[in-house]
Amino acid sequence: MTIRIAIAGPRGRMGREAVALVQQTDHFELAAVIDRRYDGQNLAEIDGFSGVNAPIYTDAARCFAEVKPDVLIDLTTPEAGKRHTELALRYGVRPVVGTTGFTPEDIERLTKLAEEKEIGAIIAPNFAVGAVLMMKFARMAAKYFTDVEIIELHHDQKLDAPSGTALKTAQLIAEVRPSKKQGHPNEKETLAGARGAEYDGIPIHSVRLPGFVAHQEVIFGGNGQTLTIRHDSFDRRSFMSGVKLAVETVMHLHTLVYGLEHILE
């Protein structure tokens, strides 16, 4: 069965990889793209997309109404991603979203909408399979090491901090670890923020520098030992195997799934 796909954000770095993925996959068809510019033009007319035929829409609702794609791949910004996800569900389009910034309230509201429409949706803070495994391994380790800190490192153009992956990792760890205050009970920051942000007592540190793509390490400490679990994405192609899996899986879902780990066997 051919899956007809609309891509939001095709000119971004992740969006370009998604366009290439769709073009290279026999049972995927690029039905349309959603962009801030070039309304009414064809993607093939844009530099870097020679031979890639797809109508360009600046209005997501009009795209969904006229093209009726099976799936939306959204790799845009938190604000646009939230708007596109809700619109897609209302028009019966299954969203696969790699945008971070969704709150628990957003997830709850969108889950209800997906179930009302009886269609699937997948929102994943990270589509790299290795990163998802890192999160799963961290959750396993937290049962035995309750002292933990997270360091995430990304390119200096990333808008949100901490990353969605770091927050998701902390949430998974918190599910199996008692909430606690780490470090010395009388610890004092001599420079505000030196110990990082906190999620349920878990310090999270964000690094933003040119040269990085997406990297994270989870450091556990115990008596006489430490355990470090680290994942590195050196190229945005690392995310595409997860995007492909999500597109194929969302066609068979009837609810929203948050996190790629829930669809990995």
Swiss-Prot record:
PROSITE patterns: DAPB (PS01298). It catalyses: (S)-2,3,4,5-tetrahydrodipicolinate + NAD(+) + H2O = (2S,4S)-4-hydroxy-2,3,4,5-tetrahydrodipicolinate + NADH + H(+); (S)-2,3,4,5-tetrahydrodipicolinate + NADP(+) + H2O = (2S,4S)-4-hydroxy-2,3,4,5-tetrahydrodipicolinate + NADPH + H(+). GO terms for biological process: diaminopimelate biosynthetic process; lysine biosynthetic process via diaminopimelate. Its EC number is 1.17.1.8. (S)-2,3,4,5-tetrahydrodipicolinate binds at residues 155, 164-165. It is found in: Cytoplasm. GO terms for molecular function: 4-hydroxy-tetrahydrodipicolinate reductase; NAD binding; NADP binding; oxidoreductase activity, acting on CH or CH2 groups, NAD or NADP as acceptor. InterPro entries: DapB_C (IPR022663), DapB_N (IPR000846), DapB_N_CS (IPR022664), DHDPR_bac (IPR023940), NAD(P)-bd_dom_sf (IPR036291). Keywords: Amino-acid biosynthesis, Cytoplasm, Diaminopimelate biosynthesis, Lysine biosynthesis, NAD, NADP, Oxidoreductase. Pathway: Amino-acid biosynthesis; L-lysine biosynthesis via DAP pathway; (S)-tetrahydrodipicolinate from L-aspartate: step 4/4. It is an enzyme of class 1 (oxidoreductase). NAD(+) binds at residues 9-14, 98-100, 124-127. Gene3D superfamilies: Dihydrodipicolinate Reductase, domain 2, NAD(P)-binding Rossmann-like Domain. NCBIfam families: dapB. Catalyzes the conversion of 4-hydroxy-tetrahydrodipicolinate (HTPA) to tetrahydrodipicolinate. Belongs to the DapB family. This is 4-hydroxy-tetrahydrodipicolinate reductase. The gene is dapB.
